[in-house]
């Protein structure tokens, strides 16, 4: 049996877009296929490796670079590593890409208006849009969308299963997975985009 080749799948997108949902589904899909895989969630890294960091650009960059550092260690040791922080700044994402090398960027597209209308149960986007919360990514703090991501999914027009299938299909086209990893069955899809929560955009609420 050939040795597993590590690579990183890096999800980026606004809070509430669907990153954590699709990343977790992908993680379980890979596990079910016997791949060595780990998932690095932006909130969990903040809690365990980045305590004390705020939401200034410098602090956000530090958190993302720490995720990139850990992802690089895992990747070079043959682990398929899934990262799903907001990672709003292109320069920092590019730094992680350069560090890791074996890097696939997945842009999870959803607009602020769409998220505020459909996936904002605590009303955080509405408060940010009203000026009641400041430093909120996508509202008064920038989110620099990728222009050349290897994979793009639109979670407003796709079901979770469709988004996952598209990611797997593109990973096969990119030579990252084989045919045995591509087909998704309903039994392994365990969460939906209706469970999304606004997270890590200035006010931290766990995104399931």
Language-model features, listed with the residues they occupy:
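Extreme N-terminal, non-catalytic leader segments
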Residues: 1-8
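Hydrophobic anchor at the beta1->P-loop junction of P-loop NTPases
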Residues: 11
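The conserved Walker
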Residues: 15
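Conserved lysine of the Walker
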Residues: 19
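Conserved substrate/cofactor phosphate-moiety recognition/catalytic segment
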Residues: 23-69, 76
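ATP-dependent NMP and nucleoside kinases share a basic, alpha-helical "lid"
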Residues: 48, 52-54, 71-129, 135
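Small-molecule kinase domains that catalyze NTP-dependent phosphoryl transfer to phosphate-bearing small molecules
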Residues: 109, 117-166, 174-186, 190-192
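Short linear proline/tyrosine/threonine-rich motifs used for host-factor recruitment
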Residues: 197-198, 204-206
């Amino acid at each position: 049996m050939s040795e597993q080749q590590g690579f990183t799948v890096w999800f980026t997108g606004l809070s509430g877009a669907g990153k954590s949902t699709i990343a977790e589904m992908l993680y379980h899909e890979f596990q079910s296929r016997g791949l060595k895989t780990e998932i690095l969630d932006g909130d969990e890294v903040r809690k365990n490796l980045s305590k004390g960091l705020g939401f200034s650009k410098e602090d956000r960059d530090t958190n993302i670079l720490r995720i990139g550092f850990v992802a690089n260690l895992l990747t070079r040791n043959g682990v398929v590593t899934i990262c799903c922080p907001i990672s709003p700044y292109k320069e920092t994402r590019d730094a992680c890409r350069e560090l890791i090398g074996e890097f696939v960027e997945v842009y999870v597209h959803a607009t602020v208006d769409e998220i505020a209308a459909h996936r904002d149960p605590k009303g955080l986007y509405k408060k940010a849009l009203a000026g009641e919360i400041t430093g909120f990514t996508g509202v008064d703090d920038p989110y620099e969308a990728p222009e050349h991501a290897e994979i793009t999914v639109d979670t407003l027009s796709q079901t979770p299963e469709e988004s996952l299938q598209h990611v797997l299909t593109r990973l096969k086209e990119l030579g990252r997975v084989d045919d045995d990893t591509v087909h998704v069955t309903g039994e392994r899809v365990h969460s939906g985009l209706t469970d999304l929560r606004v997270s890590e955009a200035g006010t931290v609420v766990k995104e399931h």
